[in-house]
């Protein structure tokens, strides 16, 4: 075969392959159209394709026309049901670590807020850490003087549990130097107290929008729990104090629906003092263990019913759980009266387990260092000293601080009971350490049906920071 014949043969073969390829494509298109039409899903160039992307604060709907995109924003659908929260507390044999934010360690080189009073609260889908910022960052000049409790720069913010209180993930909640927050199953409600000491105001936000307010009724530093409020069947409850920190003050229970106050009642507690209650739901009622900042080293107990009737007294146990306090052996316990004659105090918590009680306390009797949780047999109803369980959370070589309670709802756990959980604040900086600032991180623990070994989950930041050396 001469060269011309070879060229003709190759060209003919190529042309044949090309024609076959075209035929196959035509057949493919015909088959596709027939199949789509038979299935009722034939596409029209004038039709639309809608894709929805669920984001944190909105649903983004993208409508794709032929050669055109139209983007519109539609309201994110809210949860349909209120949480029940009438289940009993689960029995806890020990407490397992749930989260640790390490905020101060990260903040030595990261954009982390200076905070105090962190606490945790949960919705049906997530738990969040709330905290009161000082309007400044760690290792920055504006952190100077942040040992002060109340200032116009303080705000309530939140992050998903386990995240550090950093600039990039924090969500603004309220202007506040005292606060509480909880979720009713549909939306978050926050109560943020701010303003001058003699005319402070509490703003109730629901779904991020101001809905109601509470003005100071005693003109002496209106304040609230610094931990989670409690929602039962859509009604949310919290406790507030107005008046002196070192003598008789005035105390009120508030009840709100969808962020609007629908009830309140004064607590009659002559001779007793209530501040910074740590509350949780249990069998349809709200149970609180509070702080007596006047005289008692035993903790006030408050049990609230849905009609705002209440019982108030002191944790009966013959072991004191406030700080400062005396020796355990010298304490007798009382269900009705403050004992110990030690002023000041620290926010704390406990959980009723039948007639027993789990109670948290600092290991030190005189300072906010170390932390342990102990189980006292019949400690809810009797002056019992029978300590049947002890778990160390922070050893006594490291700083602790406030502590408080919350529960995991059944929507999260799929259990038939509410899991008891607590957090412990670890305060660093002033007044105990040589820094220009005061801030804290936290460790969070949740009840399990197994014993858990003691350990020290302390803060671990190495101080002072660079800003403290200038």
UniProtKB/Swiss-Prot annotation:
Organism of origin: Influenza A virus (strain A/Equine/Tennessee/5/1986 H3N8)
- The segments labelled Involved in apical transport and lipid raft association in the record are 11-32
Question: TM spans, by residue?
Answer: 15-35
Enzyme Commission identifier(s): 3.2.1.18
Its protein name is Neuraminidase
Q: Which lineage do the record's taxonomy fields give for this organism?
A: Viruses, Riboviria, Orthornavirae, Negarnaviricota, Polyploviricotina
The positions flagged as active site in the entry are: 149, 402
Q: What is known of its domains?
A: Intact N-terminus is essential for virion morphogenesis. Possesses two apical sorting signals, one in the ectodomain, which is likely to be a glycan, and the other in the transmembrane domain. The transmembrane domain also plays a role in lipid raft association.
Q: How does the annotation summarize its subunit structure?
A: Homotetramer.
Query: Which cofactor(s) does the record list?
Result: Ca(2+)
Q: Where would I find glycosylation on this chain?
A: 39, 46, 54, 84, 144, 293, 398
Could you tell me which residue ranges are on the Intravirion side of the membrane? 1-14
Annotated GO biological processes are: carbohydrate metabolic process; viral budding from plasma membrane
Q: What is the activity-regulation note?
A: Inhibited by the neuraminidase inhibitors zanamivir (Relenza) and oseltamivir (Tamiflu). These drugs interfere with the release of progeny virus from infected cells and are effective against all influenza strains. Resistance to neuraminidase inhibitors is quite rare.
Gene transcribed to yield this protein? NA
GO MF term set: exo-alpha-sialidase activity; metal ion binding
Do you know which Gene3D superfamilies this protein is assigned to?
A: 2.120.10.10
UniProt keyword annotation of DNA repair present: no
Q: How is it modified after translation?
A: N-glycosylated.
Disulfide cysteine pairs (residue numbers): 90-417, 122-127, 182-229, 231-236, 277-290, 279-288, 316-335, 421-446
The record's listing under HAMAP family reads:
INFV_NRAM
């Amino acid at each position: 075969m001469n060269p011309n014949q070879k060229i003709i043969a190759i060209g003919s073969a190529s042309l044949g392959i090309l024609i076959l390829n075209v035929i196959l494509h035509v057949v493919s298109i015909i088959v596709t159209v027939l199949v789509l039409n038979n299935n009722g899903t034939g596409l029209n160039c004038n039709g639309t394709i809608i894709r929805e992307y669920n984001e944190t604060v909105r649903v983004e709907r993208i409508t794709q026309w032929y050669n055109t995109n139209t983007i519109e924003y539609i309201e994110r659908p809210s949860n349909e049901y209120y949480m029940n929260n009438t289940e009993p507390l689960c029995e806890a044999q020990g407490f397992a670590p749930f989260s640790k934010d390490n905020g101060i360690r990260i903040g030595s080189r990261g954009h982390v807020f200076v905070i105090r009073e962190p606490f945790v609260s949960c919705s049906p889908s997530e738990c969040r850490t709330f905290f009161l910022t000082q309007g400044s960052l760690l290792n920055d000049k504006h952190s100077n003087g942040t040992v002060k409790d109340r200032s116009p720069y303080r705000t309530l913010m939140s992050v998903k549990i386990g995240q550090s209180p950093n600039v990039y993930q924090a969500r603004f909640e309220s202007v506040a130097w005292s606060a509480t927050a909880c979720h009713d199953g549909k939306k978050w409600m926050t109560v943020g107290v701010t303003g001058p000491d003699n005319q402070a105001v509490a703003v109730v936000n629901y779904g991020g929008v101001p809905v109601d307010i509470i003005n100071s009724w005693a003109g002496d530093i209106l304040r609230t729990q610094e931990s989670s409020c409690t929602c039962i069947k859509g009604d949310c409850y919290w406790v507030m104090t107005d008046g002196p920190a070192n003598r008789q003050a005035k105390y009120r229970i508030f009840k709100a629906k969808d962020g609007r106050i629908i009830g309140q009642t004064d607590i009659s507690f002559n001779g007793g003092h209530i501040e910074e209650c740590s509350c949780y739901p249990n069998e349809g009622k709200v149970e609180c263990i509070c702080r007596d900042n006047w005289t008692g080293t035993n903790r006030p107990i408050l049990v609230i019913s849905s009609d705002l009737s209440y019982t108030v007294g002191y944790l009966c146990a013959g072991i004191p759980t406030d700080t400062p306090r005396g020796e355990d052996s010298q304490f007798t316990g009382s269900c009705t009266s403050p004992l110990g004659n030690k002023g000041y105090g620290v926010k704390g918590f406990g959980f009723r387990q039948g007639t027993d009680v789990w109670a948290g306390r600092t290991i030190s009797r005189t300072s906010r260092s170390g932390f342990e949780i102990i189980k006292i047999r019949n400690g809810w109803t009797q002056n019992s000293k029978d300590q049947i369980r002890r778990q160390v959370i922070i050893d006594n070589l490291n700083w602790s601080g406030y502590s408080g309670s919350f529960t995991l709802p059944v929507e999260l756990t799929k259990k038939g009971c509410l899991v008891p959980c607590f957090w412990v604040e670890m305060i660093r900086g002033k007044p105990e350490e040589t820094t220009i600032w005061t801030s804290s991180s936290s460790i969070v623990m949740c009840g399990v049906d197994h014993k858990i070994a003691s350990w020290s989950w302390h803060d671990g930041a190495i101080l002072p920071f660079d800003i403290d050396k200038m």
